[in-house]
């Protein structure tokens, strides 16, 4: 038992690996949804000027609420499950990604090849999918890679506070939360995972 055992005699090393797998799976799903929805919304937002006032106000409203308060409130109101965590994190993250992609698309929207495509009669959807999204594919990969640890951190925070996953689910947040209860006698149970 490299990390020792908890109060019930369960191996913390094995639970940490299993919890890491569950947390990575949740983080990967959230990253896919955030970047996927944010990319499409940001592409349309950056290319279509009519959406700009509405999306700016939506962005301002959603980002003025601190993310930790938002996540704790949603997790507290809804039942604790993977779906609840996924919905609460994904409903907040896509707008930040959309703003990021919008800013990049604004810089390449008025390029000569986009103007030429528009003059030749290409639809907005075709210009966005054929000309703009291939230009930002490296940013899509980078944002997805950065979104995974952020989502894992949020899951650990919610589990530590006690509003994350159910107690019987093995996640990093629940392992740290269980280690917090015996921190004074066995600090390694909280610090090692």
Model-derived features with residue positions:
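Glycine-rich helix-loop "coupling/hinge" segments at transmembrane-helix boundaries
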Residues: 75-79, 105, 153-192
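Generic hydrophobic transmembrane alpha-helix motif, especially the helices
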Residues: 2, 6, 33-38, 43-47, ...
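Transmembrane alpha-helix boundary and packing residues in multipass membrane permease domains
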Residues: 43, 72-76, 85, 89, ...
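C-terminal transmembrane helix and the adjacent membrane-cytosol boundary/short C-terminal tail
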Residues: 49, 78, 82, 88-92, ...
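Short membrane-interfacial helix/loop motifs at transmembrane-helix boundaries
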Residues: 1-14, 162-163
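Transmembrane alpha-helix signature in integral membrane proteins
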Residues: 12-44
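Hydrophobic alpha-helical elements at and bordering transmembrane segments
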Residues: 12, 16, 20, 24, ...
């Amino acid at each position: 038992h490299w990390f020792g055992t908890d109060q019930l005699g369960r191996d913390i090393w094995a639970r940490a690996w299993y919890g890491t797998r569950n947390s990575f799976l949740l983080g990967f799903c959230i990253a896919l949804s955030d970047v996927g929805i944010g990319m499409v919304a940001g592409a349309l937002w950056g290319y279509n000027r009519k959406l700009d006032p509405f999306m700016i106000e939506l962005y301002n409203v959603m980002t003025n609420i601190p993310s930790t308060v938002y996540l704790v409130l949603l997790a507290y109101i809804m039942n604790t499950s993977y779906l609840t965590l996924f919905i609460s994190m994904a409903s907040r993250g896509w707008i930040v990604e959309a703003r990021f992609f919008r800013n990049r698309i604004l810089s390449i929207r008025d390029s000569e090849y986009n103007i030429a495509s528009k003059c030749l009669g290409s639809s907005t959807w075709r210009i966005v999918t054929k000309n703009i999204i291939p230009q930002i594919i490296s940013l899509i990969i980078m944002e997805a890679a950065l979104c995974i640890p952020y989502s894992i951190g949020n899951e650990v925070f919610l589990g530590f506070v006690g509003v994350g996953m159910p107690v019987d689910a093995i996640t990093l947040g629940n392992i740290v939360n269980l280690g917090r209860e015996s921190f004074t006698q066995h600090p390694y149970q909280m610090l090692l995972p």
